[in-house]
UniProtKB/Swiss-Prot annotation:
Gene (name only): obg
Binding residues annotated for GTP, in chain numbering: 166-173, 191-195, 213-216, 283-286, 314-316
UniProt similarity note: Belongs to the TRAFAC class OBG-HflX-like GTPase superfamily. OBG GTPase family.
Compositional bias segments (type: Basic and acidic residues): 371-382
Designated name of the protein: GTPase Obg
Top EC group: hydrolase
Alphabetical list of CDD domains matching this protein: Obg
Pfam families reported in the protein's UniProt record: GTP1_OBG (PF01018), MMR_HSR1 (PF01926)
Organism from which the protein derives: Psychrobacter arcticus (strain DSM 17307 / VKM B-2377 / 273-4)
Length: 405
């Protein structure tokens, strides 16, 4: 299944039915008076979060969704039947944005959560409502109101507690294979991972958290190089960032500079994102002789000026992986408990995530506009640099997204 994380959808709520003008016609009841019923209410349009889908691909091909129009009123003061509400299933983690106002209508982050996105029109009034002492036989009835028409953007961000970041081939996919049942593709070439992969890290005794493997970043990603920041937005919902650094790159590059590239790209793309708690993971320690390992790791940490938590791992063999799992689980549990016990902290966390998502959305759109402008200028013969990021609808890769329980 193709992984599609954005779609622009037009939704139309149902129109209300018309009220009617009719009169009571019954034997032995002369001048029976008005008995026109009201029109029914048009169906609303909702989105509902479901856990059996993890892509918006259906909305890439079917872009218009209309609720049915309600019935008109009937005689004998019978109202028309209202039309059924329309429910559009979306993956958990979908944000609904009004394209005209850029207003975020809501986030769907729980199974079964619903959100009203277009309200159906009310039914018109039958002529019974217009009877008065001076007008015993009104012939007036009103039409039903139109349902709301909206053009909305569905944005999917994976819901994960921990986001894996790093250069291509830093060992992120191997790491998530070690700690969960997810089986992303692993190979010895860059950009093996083309879409986010989710894995549930099960510690046991009902203790677990979700980890997201994000496609590798390269220098200039914040400006569109490589895969750009197309998938960087998926770490906007995470509580922690796990920064994997290959301490012995096969291309002979400097691991310190490689780490700085990621830190700089994060900061350039979103300072709020760069301020998320980060853990530095010095990976592939099995590729360095034991007598050189401690000196190399100490050098990397010192050169980066890193004052946070540092782990050493060999993801291929699993060495050091369990320590990271348990550390993350303990930290996440403490944070969850504090959010429950401390309303002020919970509100601050919510505000931080809202700021982060707003900043990520703004920067993503800005980059897309810059890309479109560059592409237009290139077609017109202006010498502007192009890049590999494509914000259009035809840049999707036919790849699979893996969501393993």
């Amino acid at each position: 299944m193709r992984f599609i994380d954005e779609a622009v959808v037009t939704v139309k709520a149902g129109d209300g039915g018309n009220g009617i003008a009719s009169f009571r016609r019954e034997k032995y009841v002369p001048r029976g008076g008005p008995d026109g019923g009201d029109g029914g209410k048009g169906g609303d349009v909702y989105v509902i979060a479901e856990d059996n889908t993890n892509t918006l691909v259906d909305y890439r091909y079917t872009r218009r969704h209309d609720a049915m129009r309600a019935e008109n009123g009937h005689s004998r003061n019978c109202s028309g039947k209202g039309s059924d509400d329309l429910f559009l299933p979306v993956p958990i983690g979908t944000t609904i944005v009004d394209t005209e106002t850029d207003e975020v209508l809501g986030d769907l982050i729980e199974i079964g959560q619903t959100l009203l996105i277009a309200k159906g029109g009310d039914g018109g009034l039958g002529n019974t409502h217009f009877k008065s002492s001076t007008n015993q036989a009104p012939r007036k009835a009103t039409s039903g109101f139109e349902g709301e028409l909206k053009v909305l953007k569905f944005e999917l961000k994976v819901v994960a507690d921990v986001g894996l970041i790093g250069l291509p081939n830093a060992g992120k996919s191997t790491f998530i294979r070690q700690v969960s049942a997810a089986r992303p593709k692993v190979a010895d070439y860059p950009f093996t991972t083309l879409v986010p992969n989710l894995g549930v890290v099960d510690i046991g005794r009902h203790r677990s958290f979700v980890m997201a493997d994000i496609p590798g970043l390269i220098e200039g990603a914040s400006e569109g190089a490589g895969l750009g920041i197309r998938f960087l937005k998926h770490v906007a919902r995470t509580r922690r960032l796990l920064h994997l650094v290959d301490i012995k790159p096969i291309d002979g590059s400097d691991p310190v500079e490689n780490a700085r590239i990621i830190l700089n790209e994060l900061d350039r793309f979103s300072p709020e994102l760069a301020n998320l708690p980060q853990i530095l993971v010095l990976n592939k320690i099995d590729q360095v002789p034991e007598e050189e390992l401690n000196e190399l790791c100490t050098h990397i940490v010192a050169e980066l000026g890193w004052t946070g938590i540092v782990f050493r791992t060999a993801t291929l063999t699993g060495e050091g992986v369990d320590a990271i799992k348990y550390h993350l689980m303990n930290e996440i549990e403490r944070e969850r408990e504090r959010e429950i016990e401390d309303p002020i902290f919970a509100e601050a966390q919510k505000a931080r995530f809202e700021r982060l998502e707003a900043e990520v959305r703004l920067n993503t759109e800005a980059q897309r506009e810059a890309y479109r402008a560059a592409r237009k200028a290139a077609r017109e013969g202006t010498d502007l640099s192009d890049d590999d990021f494509d914000g259009s609808d035809d840049d999707d890769d036919g790849v699979e997204v893996i969501y393993a329980p």
